[in-house]
């Protein structure tokens, strides 16, 4: 997608630039430059880095060989100095050095990123740069039995530094203590200056940052469906 094609004030429908197949969705918007490798994380806990030279200039390319039932949950450029972060729906978070993931070719299937518990899957994958000292982790917990869009659940915002780094392909640490009636994380995000929105695109208020790593969340006033950051 040409960088000057999107009107930030009104937005532009993705369908104007690409055709999404059944069940497909956009998970990331990344620049194609000669910069650091592109890091990918999947729902089954696979991680991969693809060298920028492998991406080429074709309008559509396959950049990872997915296992049956797997899907990409996040992607972002990641230099060797960056850290990669997985968050699973069972409230486990793992962060490790990007340098432990050697860049592979487009057709490769990646390598183990996080060791998941039985039945768990990754809901968020992020890249944190070496200088992102203000990064935070936002987690939202709720009930998987509730109808979509009806359970606001609880949320917390913790400093990224609250979470100890571990090695690739290991288990994570607890990212939020679930309250009664909650059985999973429904949403998670890592970055700086988080902004949350509801189903209609309206702004939602998140708790103040500063929560302990494994603390429980604070009840939300309304459902949060997406978290991002301001475009600067």
What positions do the PLM features span?
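Short, structured "edge-of-domain" segments at secondary-structure transitions
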Residues: 1-232
């Amino acid at each position: 997608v040409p960088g000057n094609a999107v009107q930030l004030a009104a937005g532009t429908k993705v369908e104007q630039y690409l055709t999404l197949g059944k069940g497909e969705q956009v998970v990331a918007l990344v620049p194609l430059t000669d910069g650091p490798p592109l890091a990918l994380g999947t729902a089954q806990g696979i991680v991969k880095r693809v060298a920028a030279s492998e991406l080429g200039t074709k309008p559509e390319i396959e950049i990872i060989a997915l296992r049956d039932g797997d899907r990409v949950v996040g992607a972002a450029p990641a230099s060797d100095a960056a850290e990669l972060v997985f968050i699973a729906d069972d409230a486990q978070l793992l962060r490790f050095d990007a340098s432990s993931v050697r860049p592979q070719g487009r057709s490769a299937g990646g390598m183990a990123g996080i060791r998941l518990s039985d039945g768990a899957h990754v809901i968020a994958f992020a890249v944190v740069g070496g200088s992102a000292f203000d990064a935070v982790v936002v987690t939202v917990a709720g009930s998987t039995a509730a109808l979509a869009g009806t359970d606001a659940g609880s949320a917390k915002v913790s400093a990224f530094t609250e979470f100890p780094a571990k090695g690739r392909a290991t288990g994570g640490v607890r990212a939020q203590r679930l309250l009664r009636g909650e059985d999973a994380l429904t949403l998670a995000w890592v970055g700086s200056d988080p902004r949350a929105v509801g189903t209609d695109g309206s702004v939602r208020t998140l708790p103040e940052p500063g929560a302990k790593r494994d603390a429980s969340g604070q009840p939300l006033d309304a459902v949060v469906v997406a978290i991002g950051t301001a475009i600067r």
